[in-house]
Every structure is written in C-alpha cells, then in structure tokens.
Amino acid sequence: MITVNVDLGDRAYPIHIGAGLIGRAELFAPHIKGSSVTVVTNTTVDPLYGDALRAALAPLGKHVSTVVLPDGEAYKNWETLNLIFDGLLGERADRKTTLVALGGGVIGDMTGFAAACYMRGVPFIQVPTTLLSQVDSSVGGKTGINHPLGKNMIGAFYQPQAVIADIGALTTLPERELAAGIAEVIKTGAIADAAFFDWIEANVDALNRRDPAALAHAVKRSCEIKASVVAADEREGGLRAILNFGHTFGHAIEAGLGYGEWLHGEAVGCGMVMAADLSVRLGLLDDASRQRLDAVIAAAHLPTRGPALGDARYMELMRVDKKAEAGAIKFILLKRFGDTLITQAPDEAVFATLAHTTR
C-alpha cells in the first residue's frame, strides 16, 4: 500500500492506494467517530463491492445503512441528491454519522455534497472505484451536482476524512470507463509534469491492458500532483484552475449532448485536443507537442473529434463555465508540457479550433 497525504495546513488527510483495500477495516476505523455509517453507492457498484465494504465495517461495531442510487451522470441532480437525504433522515443520522462514498465520480461528488449539506456538515470517506475518481475527482474536496445549463454548477468545497483507492476495483471497470480515467492521467502529466507525460506516452498500452504496476504508478503520481496543487490553492482561487485543462470544451460537450451521452473523461480527452489546437493557434504551443498529445489521447481509445454542436451553441455553453467572468470565456492552454496559461481567446481563434476539431 502507498499513502499520499493531502496537507491543507490546518488539517490533512490520507490517500491510501493499493489492492484489496476495500476490505481493510483498519483503514476506515480512525476516520469513523460516531455510532453510525451510511454507505452511498449505485446499482452497478453495490453488487460488486458493497458486501466487502459492509463486511469491513462490521467489526467496528457501528450501525451501517446503505443508500443505493441509479448509476450514471444523468442522475447527478437534485432529485437523486434528495434520495441521499431521504436515507439519512430515515435512519435518523446525526452530526457524527459518517458517509462513505463507494463508486465513481458521480457518487463521490454527490455524497460529498450531501455530507457538506446534511446538518450543515458531517464527515465522509471517499472509496473511489473508477480510475477517473481515483486519480482526480475523489481528491481535493470538490463536490456537487449538475444543472441543465452547466456541469457541477451547484456544489461546495468539502474535504473527505480519507480516500481509500482500491486498485483491485479497476479490474471490473468497463473499457470506456478505463479510457475516461486515463484521460485525467494524461491531463495531469500535460499540465504539471513533463516527465510524467513522457512516462504516460511510454506506458499507455500497459494502462490500457490494466497492468497493476502501471495503474498503481498512474494513480500515485496523479494524486501527488493534485495534492500539491490543492494544498497551494484549495478553493480554486488561481493555480488550481489548471486542473481544468480540457474541461472548458469538455463541459460544453457534456452539456450540449446531454449528461451521460459521453463520459466525463471522454469529453475531457477531446477537450484537451481542442485546447491544444487553440494553444497552437495563439502561438503558445509548438505543433509537435500538439501532435504528441493528440497521439496519446487516441492511443488511450478516447475521442479526438468533438460533436458538431455549432459555434453558437459551444460559445453559449462555455460562457456558463465556472471559470468565466462577466461572460468572458477563460481557457486553460498549454505553453509546453508542464506549463500552462489561463487566458481568454479571440472568438475567431476559437471558431477556427471548432472548425478543425469537430465533426
């Protein structure tokens, strides 16, 4: 087992990475102070790992209940969030009840938001079961739900007590979900660590075939990088925005097609292709680097052409992005691997990118 710590100055929490961790009671025990635990999961993950988690919690002597939600990005909304509150109130959960998020990014985001809201804040633990959630969404305290007009527009910054990333859970991940997670690994290397990006290029085939050592390294290094960024800028006042590379275009794709049509990581992968194209057009990035990024995204079996939503629709959706200010779209662009720039772009350049990178 590898442990990466997220140090926020006045508080910290561990990210435990390894195989078989869902069944290890000693990893959960230090973070559960009250007499009850509510596991929040979905209809896909609960049959796979729900019993193992509940068996691990049993020796702790806590009352354990489970809320099982429908699976998918389409359910990341108020109605589904209320199902969590219904479960908590039905169990008479109190302020010391610990929520455990067992699932991917949707479950983690909604459980964290529920924990932030219920009785104005209860503790929660992340148990991410997808590669995307292990390398990205479970770390850093971003929680929330979608709105029809924009992704993750309603939420809170609320940190978990711990993240328990069981690499073994990735063996049951569908191929599309695996590729979606690799997209966030690629993003992390591209924005923050050129040497890690080189490693990803050399090992993308190993990641595709779920080589345990490659997956463990990808999760570890991604978590180390994200932990350092979050420690420097917990609430996304500046530096942390670089983690949104590919997300301005990507969120527009998700909202424009309807949540769940493309996986989040698929949209981010394509969004990185689009952002790199815009970076070249603005004279920030050399074309050889753009080609390298495009190639590794394609090698991870991710889409490299965006849907034809139309220029006006893309612009409308990107203006709803959380980074936008007074309606001005802000992009995270590449100068070189490991070096980014947060900037606006002329509409003409954006239109040229859309013409070149969408169907």
From Swiss-Prot:
Cross-referenced CDD domains: DHQS (cd08195)
Keyword Zinc-finger: no
Gene name tied to this protein: aroB
Reaction equations catalysed: 7-phospho-2-dehydro-3-deoxy-D-arabino-heptonate = 3-dehydroquinate + phosphate
Listed NCBIfam families: aroB
GO molecular function: 3-dehydroquinate synthase activity; metal ion binding; nucleotide binding
Protein name (database record): 3-dehydroquinate synthase
Bound cofactor: record note: Binds 1 divalent metal cation per subunit. Can use either Co(2+) or Zn(2+).
Subcellular location: Cytoplasm
Primary location class: cytoplasm
GO biological process, one term: chorismate biosynthetic process
Keywords for the protein's UniProt record, in alphabetical order: Amino-acid biosynthesis, Aromatic amino acid biosynthesis, Cobalt, Cytoplasm, Lyase, Metal-binding, NAD, Nucleotide-binding, Zinc
Sequence similarity: Belongs to the sugar phosphate cyclases superfamily. Dehydroquinate synthase family.
Cofactor(s) required, per the database record: Co(2+); Zn(2+); NAD(+)
Domain of life (superkingdom): Bacteria
Annotated function: Catalyzes the conversion of 3-deoxy-D-arabino-heptulosonate 7-phosphate (DAHP) to dehydroquinate (DHQ).
Pfam families reported in the protein's UniProt record: DHQ_synthase, DHQS_C
Residues where NAD(+) binds: 71-76, 105-109, 129-130, 142, 151
Binding site for Zn(2+): 184, 247, 264
Lineage summary: Bacteria, Pseudomonadati, Pseudomonadota, Betaproteobacteria, Burkholderiales
